[in-house]
């Protein structure tokens, strides 16, 4: 009973709020003249903000217009990469993708009123509208497989991100609302937006003045910050429709495939798409699977000031196990992974 109360209980204070005074039917429709539940619920809209043009736009026209093309609304990144893998078979694969892979598409309400179904669903606070989404109850619903557990230190044996544990920062400390609400630009993946977030926004002044840390002087911006400052993070493997995937902690350095980011080496995370991910629904659904790596650049949210890699040069130099090498690739992996492997491990440095 307690769970159901949390899911559906509407706080009396909500009824006198700006949204509450509009009345339930103004967003949820149904039949407000009926006294019987079955009649009252005819035509009921469970998530009105899924139709933001109708419900949210009259009062929030600019945000509603921008949100339609936002990555949170379109989850376009999945489609962008799957199109490349599917090639000529995309038209056949698209309806399967729409049915199976866009569950983390988010509506306005999934941040401001309720939890996303993938996070258990239910109202956040008695139907009160949260102007600033409570990140512990919303962001983690969709980003709970990797980002959220990393940030809060929920992977066994791995510490929380120092920005959370020491400074009590949250998602909004780095990520601007434009990343969530959109900018009216129909981005094909999330990278143009998250590329605007940089460690140098806060740490750049010291770095540019000339750090006393030798690694900063030697490597400059050739290395993504996380290469030296990340803890272990999870990679996912073998995702199949209807069966899910498995995951494991990992740490691999590889070559960056994004010139706009400005560094040569980045951390890589294994993503779960395999050649036969859609085999139960469509045979040979990904004929161009080899064109896209399944070791992808990543920015783990588990930053540590001190790690075993930044204690000495030889935390990385000569330490082959932390670099993605050819022998790390599985037999069925895409050939495009050869673009991100590190062919030559930096040699161990001798003490002077």
What are these regions (language model features)?
Residues 1-119, 128-352:
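C-type cytochrome heme-c attachment and multiheme electron-transfer modules
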